Amino acid sequence: MTNDVEMKSETEELPPFPTVHILQVVKDAQQQHGLRHGDYARYRKYCAAKLERMRKALKFTNSHNCQKKRKAKFVKKWLSVESVQNVQFLNFGIFESERRYAEAMIDKITLEDNPEKSRKKFSMINSLRKAVLHATNLEKIVQESERFDAPTKLEAQAYAAWMRGMCSFESRNWQKASESLKLAKTVYEKLAEATNNTTLSSIFKGRCREIQPQLRLCEFNIAESPGAVGTMTELMELRMQMGEGGDSSVDKLISEMRASATSAEVVTIEWGGAKSTVDDEKAKQVVQEWKQTEVELAQCQTPKEKMALFEKATADTRDAIDRISDIIRRKSSENADTTVLQSIKAYLEFLKMNGTASRYLAIIDNTKSEKKSKPQDLLRLYDSVIEIYKEVAEIPGADHDKNLIQAFEVKVEYYRAFRCFYMASSYSALHKYSEAAALFDRTVSRVQDAEGKLKKLKSSSFITNETQSSLNELRSEVESAKVTVRAARLASAAGDVKTDSELAKIIDKRPLLETVNEWRQWDVRNSLKDKKTIPVASLPPAFIPMPNKPIFFDLANFHLTMPNVDDRLEKLQKDRDATPKKAAKGSSAAAASSKTSNQEEEEQQGLTGMLSGWKKSFWGNK
């Protein structure tokens, strides 16, 4: 009894742990170690290295069970309530779970890039199950220990529920995923309301926003029919909320719904003056997708959402065109009729071109909304739009529809006015005011032409984005720009505005030694204020090319023929014979001279042989 009383008193005397904000620990680690850019591999390595460091520092290492005549068996040391001596021990459960979650996301990304690697799906599910195991163990330890406060227990419960929900979500167990995600969202919402810390509140609310799209997708799949919870429009909104890095299951569900919708009905198109029935399932889905895209565009709030819609639709259209081309090639080899298929292919080409041009227009709207947009950027985009609309008339069968040809001629003239305006703005930015004024005048004439053609085809179904109000706005912008250009021209003529050459003189940083023959202006006072020195010479001096000695020095000198001096030698010999003393002296001198001449000949032959050897080694024997 006394021992029990002593143990109880010891446990009661243990101080409580401070509050552990699990989600904040996770978010800080993710933002600092790879997940800011979606690099799960880097994050996994960080979690593994941190676990190894903590096990060594806290002396909580794993062990190996050694047995005779057998390989040592790895025994993992699990976290328990008794082993938690301080708050740092909770990091074992957190980062073990995060490491497994990062491994699962790596497998998921690999599976999305390579759908044929089906084994990666099993690896992903296994990693998520291990992550759930560690998160559940963490929750159990925190709940059973009396040293942790209520916020820590709630965070552990929410984290484990979120991890279970993600595992069920990837396993397509929609019911369990919905229950777990709802629990996690409820707990995080309560924590956000209870805390006074704005940083923690924003983190909790951010996790709730992350859970919401996945929760809606679970509810959508749980319903017996899609209409019970939401329609196709709701699914598209859900995909926009999840963004580009969202789950691929939304796209799969959308394609499945479109496939089921198109398989039951007959899809007909009108192209080249004739109606054709689309039998291919992929082409059916693409035609229905473009119809649905027109409805979804009205719900888009930003140009980026429109860009994503057009990009997805054009990619699917390219795949359908490739499929139809393969069918045409196969039937042509069998001498079968391909007229209907050619018409369908031409119609898909028209959809692709029109969608690509619309995507460029969405990019233009997005570029205009940015602060650092330049007229040159918009000029290139308008060039692309005009070229695409010109190519529409060259599609086979397009000449049978006069309304289509006239409508796209109006489109070309309409966007030429905008291109001319931004070309004039580009010249104005380069201080070429005369050219800019002429182009602004041409813009006015193009606007008038576009207005006249637009009024004639106002009721055409092909003209949707081109409006009279946009032309009126362009006209007002042109008028204000013309006034600005005229004022700039007058200022430059009066000398108030510095030309490019004058600016170049001030900005010129060449040293004075290189510009001795030039007259240069230099503002000495401002240079002294800015502590700028006048460059006199560039140090160190630049390298200049210099001629070097050739590898074969003077080979031509060895081929010179010297004059014959035998007659002089005979005369010299006779003189020596006539005078004995002089001859003796002369003979010794001659012997010395002959000896030196022989040495010179030997040295000359040795040098010639060496150089001839070099010559043979470079060019070979002739």
Curated annotation (Swiss-Prot):
Keyword Nucleus: yes
GO cellular component terms, semicolon-separated: endoplasmic reticulum; nucleolus; signal recognition particle, endoplasmic reticulum targeting
GO molecular function: 7S RNA binding; endoplasmic reticulum signal peptide binding; signal recognition particle binding
Keywords attached to this entry: Cytoplasm, Endoplasmic reticulum, Nucleus, Ribonucleoprotein, RNA-binding, Signal recognition particle
GO biological process, one term: SRP-dependent cotranslational protein targeting to membrane
InterPro entries: SRP68, SRP68-RBD, SRP68_N_sf
Low complexity bias (residue ranges): 585-595
Broad class of where this protein is predominantly found: cytoplasm
Domain of life according to the entry: Eukaryota
Subcellular location: Cytoplasm; Nucleus, Nucleolus; Endoplasmic reticulum
Function statement: Component of the signal recognition particle (SRP) complex, a ribonucleoprotein complex that mediates the cotranslational targeting of secretory and membrane proteins to the endoplasmic reticulum (ER). The SRP complex interacts with the signal sequence in nascent secretory and membrane proteins and directs them to the membrane of the ER. The SRP complex targets the ribosome-nascent chain complex to the SRP receptor (SR), which is anchored in the ER, where SR compaction and GTPase rearrangement drive cotranslational protein translocation into the ER.
Family: Belongs to the SRP68 family.
Assembly description: Heterodimer with srpa-72. Srpa-68/srpa-72 heterodimer formation is stabilized by the presence of 7SL RNA. Component of a signal recognition particle (SRP) complex that consists of a 7SL RNA molecule of 300 nucleotides and six protein subunits: srpa-72, srpa-68, SRP54, F37F2.2/SRP19, F25G6.8/SRP14 and ZK512.4/SRP9. Within the SRP complex, interacts (via C-terminus) with srpa-72 (via N-terminus).
Stored PANTHER family: SIGNAL RECOGNITION PARTICLE 68 KDA PROTEIN (PTHR12860), SIGNAL RECOGNITION PARTICLE SUBUNIT SRP68 (PTHR12860:SF0)
Domain notes: The N-terminus is required for RNA-binding.
Protein name according to UniProt: Signal recognition particle subunit SRP68
Natural source organism: Caenorhabditis elegans
